[in-house]
Structures are given as C-alpha cells and as structure tokens.
Amino acid sequence: MTRRAVSRCVAVCVLCVGSLFAFADEAGGGKGERGSFTLTFSNRAEQSTNQYIAQRMGWPLLAEESAKVDYNLPDESFEVYVPADYTGDKHYGLLVFCMPHPGGKPPQNYLDSIDKHHLIWVCPNNAGNDRYVRPRMGLVIDAAVNMQSRYKIDPDRVYVSGISGGGRVASMLGVGFADIFKGGGFYIIGCNFYRQETTADGKRYYARSYSVPPAKVFRAAREQSKHVFLTGDNDGNREQTDLYYKGFKHDRFEHILYLQVPGMGHQHPDAEWFEKGLAFLDEPVATAGPATRPTARPATTRPTVAAAAASHAATQATDRATVAGQLLKSAQLYLDNKQYELAREKLKWIVQNFAGTPAAAEAKKTLDVIAGK
C-alpha cells in the first residue's frame, strides 16, 4: 500500500470516533481484525465501475453523468464487524449491507444472529439514499470483492442485504450480480424488480427498475441463490414487496421466502425477524435442474426444491437429528407466513427421510394440523 493510501486510512481513523481502524491481512484466509472497526480499500473491482454496472443492468450510460457520480475507492470507508470466534481456520459467510442513511454499522441487536451464523458484516459508509444508485451498487460490490481477498470467506455464502432504499439496491445486486452474491439476498422493507408489475385491481403499477441479467447470471439467481423479502403489515412498501415476491415465484425462482411482520411499519425489523431471514439464507441448497417460465402463474412451486435442499443438508452433517431439526425450523418459517404448500413439501421430506428423529415426529403432527390449508 502506498504512503498516500496509508495517509488516507489514518484520516479516516481520526474521523471515525470510537471505532478501531485496522487492516486485515491482504491474503485471503488471514486472521484479520475482530470486533467492530473501519476499513478502506484501494483495489477497485472491475464489476464496480459505472460502465460495467450500466451494461449489466441495461441502463444508458452518459459520459458526463458518469464523471459526476463516480468515486475514488481509497476515499471511501466501510464498517466491518467480525465475530470474536473468527480465527481464519475455517470459512465464514459474508453479509454485505447497504443502508438508507450514511452510517454503515450493524444494529447492535443483530450481532447475535451474525455471530450465530458465522458471518462477517461489511457496509459502506456514505452510501445512503441521498447518493446515486450506481456508486451505491459499486461500493457494495467493492466491499464483497475486497473482503474475500482479506478474510477466509465461503464464496457460496456471500450475501447482499439492505434496508429501505438499501434493500432496493441489494435486490438489484442479488439478481443482477448473482455471480458475486452467490448466496443470495435479504431485502428488507424495500426491493426492485426487472419487470413492470400491476396491482391486482389493475389501478396501479410499479415500473421496471433494471433489465434481466445475462442468461448464466439469471439462471444462478433463480436456481442457486436464495432471496428473502421482508416487509410489515403497515409498511408503505408492503404491496410492492408482495407483488415482486409473486413475480419471483412466477418466474420460478426456486429458493424464496416472504416475511410479513405483524404490526410493523417502515422500520428495521427486530432481532427475531432478522434471524428468520438469515436462517433461511444459511440453509444449504442443492443445484436444481433448469427452470422455465410458465405461461400462467402456477398455484404452487416446484416440489423438488425442499427435497434438494434437504438432500444437500444431509451430506453436510453426520447427526441426522440435527439435520432434521434444522429443516424443521425452515419449515416453520413457511408456516409462520402461511406458505403452507412450501411448508408441507419440506415437512413430508423430513418424515420420509428422517424417520425416528424427534423432528420427524413433530413434522408428522404438523402435517395433520395443516391438512386442508
């Protein structure tokens, strides 16, 4: 790193009162710093440039406009949280976040879930709703790429998330850059879509925000990535979130979850609901066969999804009871949101493949309870 870059880092440290500035090891897998601190990066990713993002998202690119909204990466800063038990000996997941306001630190009540799922948090500062969308997207991409070179990260567990306007940014990255955010995304009280959607009464519509990405990327987003949509009963974006979730379902996205928090408005969800989203993202999945868009909206999703996920999970653990318990928790997420067909699919798989475990017995009882729903 050059002296000039180091000077910039020191300046950031002075400005970030109360936070610890530290460089993680340059090589992937380094132990790095733990706890909460601020980082800067000097190596900009090719995918974060204005031209690359505009091309990937199907947006026009005006040279004079690009110059106005572009950024110099060493001048930017990122808030990082690394769980205390990270040693660099095993791979962690990476949760790349985008806020609607200038700060990038994680809410304190989310840290337990981040620790539990062995995730590292990174979020750009000064990337709120008052900034153009392309640099916001670029900074999130730069965070994802640079953190993977500094920490031991599982590339299949790189997730993107955000709240409100940050959720909209995350939702575009989760689909448009599924080759980077291979684990998928968690879109909280805000999301965008690649197609215009009309409300059920036909009186309103929500315009398309971006274009479908290249076929290989789009297939990965539909078949391999997971996508969580979280809204609240009183969230102003609830209707749009519901429409877009149904659009994902229509287009055969195989691993999707809709969470609607009772009584919640346009605000951060509490720790319990944040944990529900992370739990779904972190459940292992297997690659399914190619999907095609139907001519009419299907009444149910494909029955192979839960079976594939369960099969993959079973290969990752030796304790059958533990695996069955994890799958039962996932089924409960569907039940909590009245997604009975998806829940039934997963419960049946548990009963058939984990006979003799407490979770199988509980799954059988639950199937009786939801019969006919």
Positions of PLM-derived features:
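Primarily recognizes the serine-hydrolase "nucleophile elbow" in alpha/beta-hydrolase
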Residues: 156-221
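The feature captures the conserved acid-bearing segment of alpha/beta-hydrolase catalytic domains
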Residues: 193-276
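A domain-start/cap signature at the N-terminus of enzymes
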Residues: 23-92, 246, 256, 290-297, ...
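Gly/Ser-rich "nucleophile elbow"/oxyanion-hole loop immediately N-terminal to the catalytic nucleophile
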Residues: 84-90, 132-165, 170, 178-181
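Alpha-helical segment of the N-proximal tetratricopeptide repeat
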Residues: 322-349, 353
